[in-house]
Amino acid sequence: MKKIGVLAIQGAVDEHIQMIESAGALAFKVKHSSDLDGLDGLVLPGGESTTMRKIMKRYDLMEPIRAFASEGKAIFGTCAGLVLLSKEIEGGEESLGLIEATAIRNGFGRQKESFEAELNVEAFGEPAFEAIFIRAPYLIEPSNEVAVLATVENRIVAAKQANILVTAFHPELTNDNRWMNYFLEKMV
C-alpha cells in the first residue's frame, strides 16, 4: 500500500489525510525531515505560503523536501503548496523551485474574492470538477516541461512536471477524489 505524507504545519491537514485514506493509501503527518523516510509521496496543503516557508525553514524541511523530489518521489501541492513548489514566486520570495513556472500569490484576489468554478480536466472526462478557490494563486510562464491540466480565465490553476503535481484550488475540501486518485495512480 502506498504511503503518503502530509506536511502538517498549517492548512487542511486532516482533510488531506481523509482524502488519501479514502483513495486507498496510508497517510502520515510530516513535521520533521525524518518523517519523510519510507514515504512514497508527499502533500503540501494550502495555508499561508510565507508562514509555511518560515516554519519549513525553522524546522529544516526545505532541503529534505527538495531531496525527496530529486529521488523521484511525488509531491502534490494545493494552493499555498503550489506557491511553495514553484520555481519562482512573484515578489522574489524563496521557494522549493520544483516546478518550472512562476506563482502569483492571491492571483484571483483576497478572501472576499474566493469562488468556486467548474473545471474541465481532460484526464478526468465528465463531469467537470467543482473546484474551490480561496485566495488562490495561479501560475505564469511555465517551461515546456510543465503540462497544464486546468485553467480558469486563461490562468493556469493545475499543472504537473515530472513527479510534481500542483493545484491552485482545494480538492481536499470537496467530496470528489479525482485529483488524489490521479496523484496516486499517475504520479506516485
Curated annotation (Swiss-Prot):
Superkingdom of origin: Bacteria
Pfam family, one: SNO
Keywords: Glutamine amidotransferase, Hydrolase, Lyase, Pyridoxal phosphate
UniProt-annotated binding residues for L-glutamine: G47, E48, S49, R105, I134, R135
Entry-linked InterPro entries: Class_I_gatase-like, PdxT/SNO, PdxT/SNO_CS
Listed EC numbers: 4.3.3.6, 3.5.1.2
MF terms in GO: glutaminase activity; pyridoxal 5'-phosphate synthase (glutamine hydrolysing) activity
Gene Ontology terms: cellular component: cytosol; glutaminase complex
Gene Ontology biological process: glutamine catabolic process; pyridoxal phosphate biosynthetic process; pyridoxine metabolic process
Transmembrane segments: none
Pathway annotation from the record: Cofactor biosynthesis; pyridoxal 5'-phosphate biosynthesis
Residues annotated as catalytic: C79, H170, E172
Keyword DNA damage: no
PROSITE patterns given in the database record: PDXT_SNO_1, PDXT_SNO_2
Catalytic function, reaction form: aldehydo-D-ribose 5-phosphate + D-glyceraldehyde 3-phosphate + L-glutamine = pyridoxal 5'-phosphate + L-glutamate + phosphate + 3 H2O + H(+); L-glutamine + H2O = L-glutamate + NH4(+)
Gene3D superfamilies associated with the record: 3.40.50.880
Subunit details: In the presence of PdxS, forms a dodecamer of heterodimers. Only shows activity in the heterodimer.
Function of the protein: Catalyzes the hydrolysis of glutamine to glutamate and ammonia as part of the biosynthesis of pyridoxal 5'-phosphate. The resulting ammonia molecule is channeled to the active site of PdxS.
PANTHER family: PYRIDOXAL 5'-PHOSPHATE SYNTHASE SUBUNIT SNO (PTHR31559), PYRIDOXAL 5'-PHOSPHATE SYNTHASE SUBUNIT SNO1-RELATED (PTHR31559:SF0)
Family recorded in the similarity comment: Belongs to the glutaminase PdxT/SNO family.
Protein name in the entry: Pyridoxal 5'-phosphate synthase subunit PdxT
